[in-house]
Amino acid sequence: MTSTSKLDANQLARQRKKLEKDRRKKVYDDQQVQGTNNSSIVSKRSVEKLYTQVLQPELGEWFQYFVPKGKRRSPAINRGYWIRMESIRQMVIRIIKANSPNVRINVVNLGCGFDPLAFQLLSLFKNQYNLNFIDIDYPDLVKNKYNMIQQSDEIKQLIGDQGSKSSDLYVMETDNYQLVGCDLKNLAYYKEILPKLVSRNVDPHPTSINIFIAEVSLAYMKPQFANPVIEISSQVNNSHFLILEQIMPDGATNAFATKMLYHFQHLRSPIQCVETYPTEKLQLQRFKRYYKHAEIKNLYGNWKFLIDYQMQKNISTIEEFDEWEEFIIFCQHYVIVHATHMDQLIYDDESSEEQKNEKAFSEMSLDSSVAISHDDRFNDEQLQLKFPAIASFKDKIYVNGGLKQTRNDENLEIDLQTGVITKLDQTENLPTARMCHTLTNLGENLVLIGGRSRPGVFFKDVYMFDTAKKWTRLADLPVGRSRHATVKISDHEVLIFGGLDASSSTTGDELFLLCNTNTNSYTPVKPIGDNDNHPIKNLQSACMIFDGKQGYIFGGMEDINVPIVNSKLYRFELVGENNISVTKVFDHSLLKRIGSKAHILENGDKLLIVGGVSPDQLFTKSTNIVTLDLNIFTFKSVEIPNVISEKVPPIFVGFELVQINNKASYIISGGAVCYSFGSCYNSVYKLEY
């Protein structure tokens, strides 16, 4: 028989101290999570202020009552928050419209924060549907929301009379809006109150529909707390669940994912579900444990599926925007899952893009003839630039312009032998600050062409850089170009393709232009041949390469409102003086890349393709760098080793691929703003083949 001795005074004191410490930690952690609401609603108010009156005035402006002092966010953050909010809103609207106007529909916002979705939808639908909204969050936060609502006559008028409350469950109660304080980690309490909440005034509405929303709220809870919330919610009548949550399709070492995880960890509000459910496949499995049906799309899938073309065009008019790569990568790290017991699926296809791509690329073999390594001799900070122009020249590499915090006009010289990066002295005729321009090596000089200042302002000036490291301005282009492609044709000729403003004609004589530095003139080059059947379009950020006899073009954006990205591979040859034969030779989703770079290897038999961003898939360690056999058109993967992914993960946006000789190339510069999480930049990487 064992006996348990009583705790002495010191042990009791230590126990009390530990309990108090645990209590304080829980309060602190909860406050940090609630703090994410404050940052989020400032961004949402920025979107509301800019977008709502132009796009959807019928929704009203309700964030203004919760954000006394607004701040304007960057275009990329604004667009990111807009698609995040609009995706949830559109999904709720489509579920509402799939049901009879007489059916009672409860919209339960779990971890609602100060989100005014209820007020937007009440404003939008007026009395067309029998809608009721239940906002649930931490008791302290809900009290703050209640106080803010009391100060807004517009909200009080919208939600109707606040009579005497039918139950102490409610911090606030009207016929169509209730505010409830509940820490969702208190599962027993949530399970107890939920049936009462959704059955309130339910006698006339026995077949009520219940739509649960968790917009990055369960993400802050460990799965052992978050999943029971989903399970409990699935047990009420006609349940729909909509969750917006982060994923990591390329794992936690992906550059964007690393930045995202660090951001939330740094705020002391780590996201807790993403490492358990990092893929679309695992998120679907998670919800199919509790619901008969589940469907999923990432936010870019929602941008394509839920937002019609006219709306996409209208958005382009609101603020200047040229951050497609950053927007797409952000969208590929967030998903919306819709789960339900009802036969009311919204998306066109239950299988995800991720699943389709998984099947397509699972059989791709490795190309052991190409290897990537990290070259750590350089001061990476000096090369933290997006969309500079870079070229090799006389055993050095030269870098012009690009985007730091702002666009710059600096010239850098990289010595590959010593690893030293030198900033060159400013000279006369210096090209002004710019990005998205090109630098082409003609042997005895470099030619800099075009680029842009702010989005939509394309440059048409052209410069020559000589062995004395001096710039000379040449004749201007007929029209400005940005995100264009260039290749050397001879020691005095540069072929220029695409990069025309959207208002320019998308086909025709001006698409290809030959720059002659001897005559200081430009000659339009007309596409001929197969171009009648498969006309090449004006592409921005396409890849063009040339081996002296023939060349290839792939990728690039056709329509910058969507964008539509080209998946075709074109082969071209110059014919005579003013014609170019352009033939479509292949079409594949792995070629659908914005801002990819490439080299022609093995005497014209192989393409080495590096980076870029695809709207269809997030490129991974296995698909970022691939080779394409140009005889049988099969891809092989160039695997990025873990030692690079874990230490200096690359992000293939706004970078350059510079060939040093027929055996090696360098990946230099490039980076991206990762939504509101901060920026990440490339190191220097060497490719050997």
Curated annotation (Swiss-Prot):
**Which intervals of the chain are annotated as region Disordered?**
1-33
In which pathway is this protein known to take part? tRNA modification; wybutosine-tRNA(Phe) biosynthesis
Ligand binding (S-adenosyl-L-methionine): 84, 111, 137, 183-184, 215
Q: Which reaction does it catalyse?
A: 7-[(3S)-3-amino-3-carboxypropyl]wyosine(37) in tRNA(Phe) + S-adenosyl-L-methionine = 7-[(3S)-(3-amino-3-methoxycarbonyl)propyl]wyosine(37) in tRNA(Phe) + S-adenosyl-L-homocysteine; 7-[(3S)-(3-amino-3-methoxycarbonyl)propyl]wyosine(37) in tRNA(Phe) + S-adenosyl-L-methionine + CO2 = wybutosine(37) in tRNA(Phe) + S-adenosyl-L-homocysteine + 2 H(+)
What cystine linkages occur within this chain?
A: none
| Residues forming coiled coils | none
How would you classify this enzyme at the top EC level? transferase
Query: What are its GO biological-process terms?
Result: tRNA methylation; wybutosine biosynthetic process
Q: Does the keyword Hydrolase apply?
A: no
Keyword field contains Electron transport: no
- UniProt keyword terms in alphabetical order: Methyltransferase, S-adenosyl-L-methionine, Transferase, tRNA processing
What molecular functions are annotated in GO for this chain? tRNA methyltransferase activity
Q: What is its EC number?
A: 2.1.1.290, 2.3.1.231
Q: Which SUPFAM superfamilies match?
A: Kelch motif, S-adenosyl-L-methionine-dependent methyltransferases
Q: Where is the composition biased (Basic residues)?
A: 14-26
Top-level taxon of origin: Eukaryota
| Assigned protein family | Belongs to the methyltransferase superfamily. LCMT family.
Read off the PANTHER family from this record.
TRNA WYBUTOSINE-SYNTHESIZING PROTEIN 4
Q: What does this protein do?
A: Probable S-adenosyl-L-methionine-dependent methyltransferase that acts as a component of the wybutosine biosynthesis pathway. Wybutosine is a hyper modified guanosine with a tricyclic base found at the 3'-position adjacent to the anticodon of eukaryotic phenylalanine tRNA. May methylate the carboxyl group of leucine residues to form alpha-leucine ester residues.
Q: What is this protein called?
A: tRNA wybutosine-synthesizing protein 4
What is the source species? Candida albicans (strain SC5314 / ATCC MYA-2876)
